[in-house]
Amino acid sequence: MKIHEYQGKEILRKFGVAVPRGKPAFSVDEAVKVAEELGGPVWVVKAQIHAGGRGKGGGVKVAKTIEQVREYANQILGMQLVTHQTGPEGQKVNRLLIEEGADIKQELYVSLVVDRVSQKIVLMGSSEGGMDIEEVAEKHPELIHKVIVEPSTGLLDAQADDLAAKIGVPAASIPQARTILQGLYKAFWETDASLAEINPLNVSGDGKVTALDAKFNFDSNALFRHPEIVAYRDLDEEDPAEIEASKFDLAYISLDGNIGCLVNGAGLAMATMDTIKLFGGEPANFLDVGGGATTEKVTEAFKLMLKNPGLKAILVNIFGGIMRCDVIAEGVIAGSKAVNLNVPLVVRMKGTNEDLGKKMLADSGLPIISADSMEEAAQKVVAAAAGK
């Protein structure tokens, strides 16, 4: 789950991290009111969407008068903001963050992630803040410094001070940076975040260290422990299909391809998508119906996939362990009839009640293309999507 910048800053503030004064605004008049409350002489008008690169897309403006605040708020609110993370369709801006201006002398980067290679929590820092860290990692990996943080001890003073010095924090400002880094770690750990990022971390001309941006991603599996985080959820920023899928306990993620995938088990779902790509196809979605799929869930899964206007074919790939193949077959038949399926459907089933499931599909009278292996299924669905 993602949240907005202003919400991330609210979290940081709770953990002792210095952030600029600011408030969200949902209308032009509200933006002006917030600016007047903050006082001048400089304000920053920032689009709030769940994507980076807002400044380059025209979603961040510096205003030097109240009238400019009004002008920029009017420009940004309601715009379809396109960044390198939104795709060409962009994301509609429904809210703003109005913030006091900052004296920017030095822009740094810090973040916390779970590193899958070392299986550790890693604090990363760089002197190259204010830009895409992926670009820095690719072109200048030597500028990214890493510290492994042990949960049993937390981020130690010496670790924080060492990283701060390496990324260029002046010696006199290192105690402030330490407070921010340790606060960021505590926020990351205590909220079950999967990412906590400050970009940029600013050092002003007088040596004051503040977080000018905040980005958090949270582990959705841990949200039951954090109702205060769930309250930050903005459904306008999420894929409607994914929201609908969650109502039926379906793990669904929209992708850019044209081949729908309905699979049981996340590992098999990823392997299925990889195999489709191996044979030249492009998956339209990740869809895991889980081990307790019912006819209703399978029908809803078909409905979700068919809402994609670019869908050309569907592959159902089931391994019947806990989930019986005859139950899936029943759901496939009912789902196909309920939605008047009009795209080619390839089904591959292996495992419990496999023969019964295949017989049910064969006797259904539906134009289902059967396959015995994942390789065969992928080849057939790629060919079907291409109209062959």
From Swiss-Prot:
Cofactor(s) needed: Mg(2+)
Pathway connected to this protein: Carbohydrate metabolism; tricarboxylic acid cycle; succinate from succinyl-CoA (ligase route): step 1/1
UniProt-listed PROSITE patterns: ATP_GRASP, SUCCINYL_COA_LIG_3
One GO term describing the cellular component: cytosol
Molecular function, one GO term: magnesium ion binding
ATP-grasp domain sequence ranges: 9-244
Residues given in the record as Mg(2+) binding sites: N199, D213
Primary enzyme class: ligase
Catalytic activity: succinate + ATP + CoA = succinyl-CoA + ADP + phosphate; GTP + succinate + CoA = succinyl-CoA + GDP + phosphate
Protein purpose: Succinyl-CoA synthetase functions in the citric acid cycle (TCA), coupling the hydrolysis of succinyl-CoA to the synthesis of either ATP or GTP and thus represents the only step of substrate-level phosphorylation in the TCA. The beta subunit provides nucleotide specificity of the enzyme and binds the substrate succinate, while the binding sites for coenzyme A and phosphate are found in the alpha subunit.
Designated name of the protein: Succinate--CoA ligase [ADP-forming] subunit beta
Source organism (scientific name): Burkholderia vietnamiensis (strain G4 / LMG 22486)
Gene: sucC
